[in-house]
Amino acid sequence: MKQFRFIDLFAGIGGFRLGLEAVGGICVGSAEIDQQAIKVYRQNWPTDRSEHNLGDITTLQQLPAHDLVVGGVPCQPWSIAGKNQAFDDPRGQLWADVIRLVRINQPKAFIFENVKGLIDPRNRLCLESILDSFKAEGYNVYYKLLNSFDYGVAQNRDRVFIIGIQQKLGVPDFSFPEYSESEQRLYDILDNLQTPSIIPESLPIQRNLFGERIEVGFNKLTPRGAFNDFFILNDIRNGPTSIHSWEIYATTEREKQICTTIMRNRGNPRYGDCDGNPMSYQDIADLVVDLAESELQVLIQKRILRQYEDGKYEFFNRRLSGGIDGTYRIFLPHARFFGRLTARGMHDEIAEISVSGATAEAYKQNFIQQILIPKRHRPITVNEAARIQGFPATFKFHSNQSANFRLIGNSVAPPVIMALGKALPNDHLFEPELCEV
């Protein structure tokens, strides 16, 4: 395996570095300004010289001698759920600095990572501008949306990767790495989970002619005909693995009927333009026979409903991702992946045991009785989050736990970077005599 030198821009805690060092890369400089990230980075690479951190990329010009430049460019402006400010946001302007550094230093190749929002149709002009800028500097450019799950990471995490290779090198076209399915389960990588004797039947992942995974069912990583291996706690959606507050709290059959009726009808356009709308007492009374308003007041006392100033009723837990009592999804130990780790934190937890069932309803009731009611579920730890992201168990963090979760959520998954590093045509890119350090 040939060695090559690389610059780690927006280094974070070193996800790119871990992946590239595993395939012969030698980091000759990193750039990061987040002090908490720098502290974690230094803990894990303590022998780096002080000048190894190049600092703020907006002030950089000439970089240390290198072959490859990599980095996860700050991505918030491209969020599909955000305001799509893109280049109008100062963080979006960092792309201009990346392009400038490529122009000045002319690396043989580069790898840049971003959120999937970058390839959203609303951001098409911005993406084309980035690609055209790199092409104008003499690079063949390739991009693709990759999911970490396809490269052995226990996480459903989509990211866009942009690869550039100098045209004048005349190397073969770049091909993104083949998928590498993993048989691991969460009980293989998380702590103190019970290995189930029976795992609910799953079918093989289905792929199209291009090898891309076919999205099926309620969750794209759950095979058709199989049970989800997680449960969603929410009051605004229904499904075989959805758990509602009225199924958890003490409620009568009549109260369950009222809640289910509201859930099924709140999206009706007659009540408003939103996906789910508050409903008046009369709206609900038209659907529930002999409804007394006092019945709705009891559901308010049980923190299932709330009432607005205009008198309309809505579920207390009205946000899907907010879950119930702060928990959104609970993954079972036999699950093949955990929820997507984010810098803003998450409301997902892990169950201590797995359950099964002959039918969807039996599966759901076994979960409620054996896991939910006895509270046999918990948040994941920092070290578990790191392993879910593909970091080694030996990776070191500092004492600020909330900062650690943020840093992990911001990081790239090292196994994906390792796969991309292996896919580079290094026999043509990296000559031995140019790799002395």
From Swiss-Prot:
Methyltransferase as UniProt keyword: yes
Active site (catalytic residues): 75
Domain of life according to the entry: Bacteria
Catalytic activity, as annotated: a 2'-deoxycytidine in DNA + S-adenosyl-L-methionine = a 5-methyl-2'-deoxycytidine in DNA + S-adenosyl-L-homocysteine + H(+)
Gene Ontology terms describing biological process: DNA restriction-modification system; methylation; negative regulation of gene expression via chromosomal CpG island methylation
Keywords on record: DNA-binding, Methyltransferase, Restriction system, S-adenosyl-L-methionine, Transferase
UniProt entry tagged with the keyword Methyltransferase: yes
Residue span, SAM-dependent MTase C5-type domain: 4-431
Pfam families: DNA_methylase
EC number(s) reported in the record: 2.1.1.37
SUPFAM superfamilies, alphabetized: S-adenosyl-L-methionine-dependent methyltransferases
Coiled coil spans: none
MF annotations from Gene Ontology: DNA (cytosine-5-)-methyltransferase activity; DNA binding
Family: Belongs to the class I-like SAM-binding methyltransferase superfamily. C5-methyltransferase family.
PANTHER family: CYTOSINE-SPECIFIC METHYLTRANSFERASE, DNA (CYTOSINE-5)-METHYLTRANSFERASE 1
Protein task: A methylase that recognizes the double-stranded sequence 5'-GGWCC-3', methylates C-? on both strands and protects the DNA from cleavage by the HgiCII endonuclease.
Protein name: Type II methyltransferase M.HgiCII
